C-alpha cells in the first residue's frame, strides 16, 4: 500500500502484488526512453520510502524500457534476471538495472557444466581452491586498482616488492600473470564463474 500511494495515477502507473514479498511497478516515463536517470530516481524513492516508513530493506530489479505493451512480460523477466544476477555478482547493490549487468548476465545464462569445464581449463595446474583468502583479497584489490602495482600496494599497505612476490606466486600456482591484460581478464571471468557456481550450490 505504501508503494501504491506513491503512484496515484491508476491510468498510467500500475503496482501489482506478485506474492507477500514481491511487487511489480509498471511506470509510464516522461523523459527520454533511453535515459535511466528517471528510473533510478524512482527506484531510490521507493527504497527510501520502504526504509523510512516500514524499516524494510529491498532489492529492486529494473528491466529495459517497454515501447509496446506486448513486450511487458519480457521486461518483467529482465527485472527478475537483474535481481538474480545481482544476488550473485553485486551483493552490495540494492538497485540493479538489466542494462548494467555486464558479463555477469552472460555467465548467468551458461549451463553449469560449461562453467565447470571453463574452470578446469583455466586452472590446469591447480584448482582455484588452492588460492587462500589473502591471495584472493590481493587479486581483487589488484583488479579494483586497474592492474596498477604501485596503487594496489599502497591500498594494501604493503611494499611494492611484496605485491610483486604475491603476483609471482599466483603465476606459479595458476600459470596466469595478472599483470598481463589478457591473463587478468581470464582470471576475472574465472572468479565470477566460480562465484556463480557457488551460488548454484547454495554457497555464497
Set out the residue ranges of the language-model regions.
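Cytosolic nucleotide-utilizing catalytic cores of signal-transduction proteins
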Residues: 1-204
Amino acid at each position: 500500500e505504501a508503494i501504491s500511494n506513491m503512484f496515484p495515477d491508476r491510468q498510467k502507473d500500475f503496482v501489482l502484488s506478485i506474492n507477500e514479498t514481491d511487487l511489480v511497478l509498471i511506470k509510464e516515463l516522461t523523459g527520454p526512453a533511453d535515459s535511466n536517470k528517471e528510473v533510478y530516481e524512482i527506484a531510490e524513492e521507493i527504497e527510501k520510502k520502504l526504509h523510512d516508513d516500514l524499516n524494510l530493506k529491498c532489492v529492486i530489479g529494473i528491466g529495459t524500457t517497454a515501447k509496446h505493451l506486448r513486450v511487458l512480460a519480457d521486461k518483467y523477466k529482465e527485472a527478475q534476471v537483474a535481481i538474480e544476477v545481482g544476488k550473485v555478482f553485486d551483493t552490495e547493490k540494492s538497485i540493479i538495472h538489466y542494462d548494467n549487468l555486464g558479463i555477469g548476465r552472460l555467465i548467468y545464462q551458461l549451463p553449469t557444466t560449461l562453467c565447470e569445464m571453463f574452470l578446469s581449463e583455466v586452472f590446469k595446474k591447480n584448482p582455484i581452491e588452492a588460492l587462500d583468502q589473502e591471495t584472493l583479497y590481493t587479486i581483487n584489490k589488484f583488479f579494483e586498482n586497474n592492474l596498477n602495482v604501485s596503487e594496489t600496494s599502497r591500498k594494501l599497505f604493503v611494499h611494492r616488492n611484496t605485491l610483486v612476490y604475491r603476483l609471482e606466486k599466483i603465476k606459479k600456482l595458476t600459470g596466469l600473470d595478472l599483470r598481463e591484460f589478457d591473463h587478468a581478464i581470464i582470471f576475472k571471468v574465472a572468479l565470477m564463474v566460480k562465484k556463480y557456481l557457488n551460488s548454484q550450490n547454495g554457497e555464497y
